[in-house]
Regions:
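Minor-groove-contacting beta-hairpin "wing" of winged helix-turn-helix DNA-binding domains
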Residues: 94-100
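Short, conserved SAM-binding/catalytic segment
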Residues: 113-121, 382, 401-416
């Protein structure tokens, strides 16, 4: 992705170790700063040189002061890498450099204020940039915001995340401009994590509760707490398997919010499930034949109950959806062929598809401020909804684009395609 302008230097062995080679040395020890003396030794070793070659000094310039051209070339390359955002000096230390945070993650993150077309189709657009900037002054009305913001993990994933102290403000700063533009029929579906713990403790974070209050203060009404039960691995390992203080986590909450409950557009008839064989047999038999009363008469069965044919069964607010799916496999394969990092949060297509069917109709606008693999955008595309996705990692924009390549009107920003190539 990064490009570096060549610098005019005296010919020598230094031409054998350019920006890519120097970067590779730092990447081999991504969490450790490297002093220049050690760097010179590693460069010599990788280039198959005797260290004396880097120590050789020759007269330079009118003054004739003697310098090592090879060491100078390496230092110039360090400066090029600094300007490209790959390396940075260790504060207060002379001649010691390290990878920047972005370089350690292997991602090209959008600078503040950047808003650039990533790719588009006839129905939607993916924008490279921070969503806190992308969705300000939006001139269209989102019918539903369907998203999974970064979780406030103690050990961030490659794409980074705010801390527990920062997460509520981070989410609200991004969502508030969208909430303001949302019509009264609009909704917000927010996939969060209950697997977040206080530092060094088995006690869980209450960031979900704090965010719930913040969203209510912003004028939204909580309509449901959907449980997404997946086949995620057992955890948390430390507190469930080692100290044995907690149970294994099996689900993530999805909070459903309405701008105005009376005009909420969610409709369970769009997500009806097939009746079970047992229930179909009950309908065919004309319904219940019993007369039963439960709970002091609060629940009663009468002859004929459940005998009326219906289009399907209303889903319960527990979604059982595995993490892997065909589109996820397609995304991973494309990213690997392009040499791109794979987004670590694997929300399946089926979760986004269910939420979009439930909360919107064809032609409605769906927005996802944290696109990741772009599954929300893809589900909106397949369901004939318009969509806008924001993503601050250029690599994730490029990888997600491959899911849309066969969609009508697909266009990938040529600069992005040239930077990362095309899947053959």
């Amino acid at each position: 992705m990064k490009s570096f302008r060549s610098r005019s230097t005296a010919p020598g062995q230094g031409e054998l170790f350019g920006a890519a080679e120097i970067t590779a040395i730092y990447e081999s020890r991504p969490d450790a700063p490297l002093d220049n003396a050690t760097l010179y030794k590693l460069v010599a070793k990788r280039a198959g040189l005797d260290e004396s070659a880097l120590n050789s000094r020759v007269p330079v310039g009118k003054s004739g002061q003697r310098h090592s051209l090879e060491r100078r070339a390496i230092r110039w390359t360090q400066q090029d890498l600094r300007r490209a955002g790959v390396l940075e000096r260790v504060p207060g230390a002379r001649g010691i450099w390290r990878l920047t945070e972005e370089a350690r993650r292997g991602l090209s993150m959008a600078k503040p204020g950047v808003k650039v077309l990533g790719f588009r189709t006839d129905l939607g657009v993916a924008i490279f940039g921070g969503s806190e900037h992308i969705f300000r002054n939006l001139d269209v009305q989102p019918i539903s915001i369907i998203c999974s913001p970064p979780y406030p993990l103690a050990k961030p994933r490659a794409y980074g995340n705010p801390s527990q102290n920062e997460i509520v403000k981070f989410i609200m700063d991004t969502l508030e401009p969208l909430i303001e533009r949302m019509p009264d029929s609009g909704s917000l579906a927010l996939n969060l994590s209950q697997d977040i713990f206080l530092p060094g403790s088995a006690a869980r974070s209450t960031y979900i509760e704090r965010l719930t209050i913040a969203l209510e203060d912003a004028g939204l009404a909580l309509m449901d707490r959907i449980v997404w039960k997946s086949n995620k691995p057992p955890g948390p390992i430390r507190y469930a398997s080692i100290t044995r203080q907690t149970l294994n986590v099996a689900y993530e909450p999805i909070l459903i919010w309405a701008k105005c409950p009376a005009r909420f557009k969610g409709d369970n008839r769009r997500v009806l499930e097939p009746h079970t064989d047992r229930h179909l047999a009950l309908i065919a038999a004309g319904g219940e034949t019993r007369t039963v009363s439960y709970g002091d008469g609060a629940y009663q069965l009468r002859p004929g109950a459940y005998g009326t044919p219906t289009e399907g069964r209303i889903p319960k607010n527990v979604l059982e959806r595995g993490l892997r799916c065909a589109y996820g496999n397609q995304y991973r394969a494309a990213a690997e062929r392009l040499g791109l990092p794979v987004h670590g949060a694997a929300q399946p297509y089926s979760v986004a598809e269910f939420l979009i069917r439930y909360l919107t109709e064809e032609g409605d606008l769906v927005v996802d401020p944290w696109a990741g693999r772009s599954m929300t955008g893809l589900a909106a595309e397949m369901l004939n909804r318009t969509w806008i996705c924001g993503e601050r990692s250029l690599e994730y924009i490029r990888g997600g684009a491959e899911l849309f390549r066969d969609q009508p009107g697909f266009y990938l920003n040529p600069q992005i395609e040239r930077a990362f190539g095309r899947v053959g």
